[in-house]
């Protein structure tokens, strides 16, 4: 019995310590109202409302009608405390003044991290546990224009960086320490009950470390298989989006 507990503890520690992709929702298919996580951790998202697949940047994407949201149960892989990257492609239309993208927590509590697709006229990556100025002042430009944009935020333990379409748009020194919480991770709404997204999301990814700009550009170009020729791939992606 002791050996089994010891092995479980080792496994949990490994999940927390290794640099990993801990969530990847491609939205290429739905099984009922469940979107499969294609990372190794199986953090599948269950949606309520009217989840609908549409044409995305890569394959299919999930449309959000201002009433739809997804929920992923708490898991050790999502209790990120040392560094993080959250990224997704998003279309943001009308609707609420604050529209959630990916948020761990049901309310503004310890352990919450949030990459908001729309935040008071802009975009933001925020954390409850970091110093006050880091929570709501590092706001990037708005992407509320009905077009696809690649939004990514990183925190490496010292600085929050916010990228839009591969360009660094906001940065702020934010040294601190995150704490885990036991809440689910929500997609497209805070706690599944407010700040609903009106638009669409594609290729949601969460890493438990901070990606470099070059690594983000590779994800933009080809999110499943990262390749060296990222700039060439990006040119093709933007040409296809403009053609549509």
What are the functions of these language-model segments?
Residues 1-3:
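Classical eukaryotic N-terminal signal peptides for Sec-dependent ER targeting/secretion
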Residues 5-67, 217-244:
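Extracytoplasmic low-complexity segments
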Residues 73-76, 138-142, 174-175:
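Beta-strand-rich interaction surfaces with strong enrichment in secreted/lumenal proteins
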Residues 163-169:
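Short strand-turn-strand beta-turns centered on an Asx-Gly dipeptide
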Residues 172-200:
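Flexible glycan-contacting loops in extracellular carbohydrate-active proteins
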């Amino acid at each position: 019995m002791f050996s089994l507990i010891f092995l479980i503890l080792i496994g949990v520690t490994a999940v927390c310590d290794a640099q990993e992709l801990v969530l990847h929702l491609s939205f290429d298919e739905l099984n009922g109202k469940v979107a499969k996580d294609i990372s190794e951790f199986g953090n599948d998202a269950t949606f309520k409302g009217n989840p609908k697949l549409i044409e995305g940047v890569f394959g299919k994407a999930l449309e959000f009608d201002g009433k739809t949201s997804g929920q992923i149960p708490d898991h050790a892989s999502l209790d990120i405390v040392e560094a993080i990257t959250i990224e997704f492609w998003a279309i943001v239309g009308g609707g609420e003044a604050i529209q959630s993208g990916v948020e761990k927590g049901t309310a503004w509590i310890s352990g919450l991290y949030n990459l908001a697709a729309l935040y008071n006229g802009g975009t933001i990556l925020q954390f409850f546990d970091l110093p006050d100025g880091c929570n709501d002042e590092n706001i990037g430009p708005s992407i509320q224009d009905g077009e696809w944009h690649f939004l990514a935020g990183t925190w490496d333990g010292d600085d929050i960086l916010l990228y839009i379409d591969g360009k660094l748009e906001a940065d702020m020194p934010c040294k601190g320490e995150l704490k885990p919480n036991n809440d689910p991770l929500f997609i497209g709404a805070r706690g599944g009950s407010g700040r609903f997204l009106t638009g669409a999301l594609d290729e949601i990814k969460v890493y438990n470390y901070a990606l470099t700009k070059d690594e983000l550009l590779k994800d933009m170009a080809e999110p499943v298989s990262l390749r060296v020729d990222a700039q060439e791939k990006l040119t093709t992606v933007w040409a296809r989006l403009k053609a549509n």
